Amino acid sequence: MANEGNLPQWVGNDPMMMEYMRDEWGRIAHGEQVVFERLCLELFQSGLSWLTILKKREAFRGAFAMFDPDVVATFGEADVDRLMSDARIVRNHRKINAVITNAHATLALRDAGGLDAIVWAYASEQPVELDGNGMLPTQSPESVALARDLKLKGFTFVGPTNMYALMCAIGVVNVREALGLV
């Protein structure tokens, strides 16, 4: 069942969330910095609602140098302390350190095609199948493989569920068609 604007009911009625779902979510997105930002935001979302992260997105961008992996990779303990005291973002030490670790891993991937190419290599031609309640799956064989591959390449805090969320968010998985949002 859809809400106003033909969005799935689970989107809710928050205007920011509805705009995000209409204009960004599931639309094809490429580029190292774009994919790195989305990976980091999905990492921060673990255990929280996406709306919480969405409302803090601009603060995250400011705090993490617009998610420029070259800059984030230079972050040290003083930066971690600064981030831990920034009430505008999610202040989780493990997640903040994971973003810095993942920035280093992103830089290391440049000689192997880059983060964008690795994530997009897991695109599937298989259509997304909704469950009996019209809900998306929480992971896929491709997201399991992507999480494993990224962990082997030095990434942390990347599991099958948040990698599936990343894949959906940037259009690697064609969720818009499955939900009738094309």
Locations of the language-model features?
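HhH-family (HhH-GPD) DNA N-glycosylase catalytic core used in base-excision repair
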Residues: M1-V182
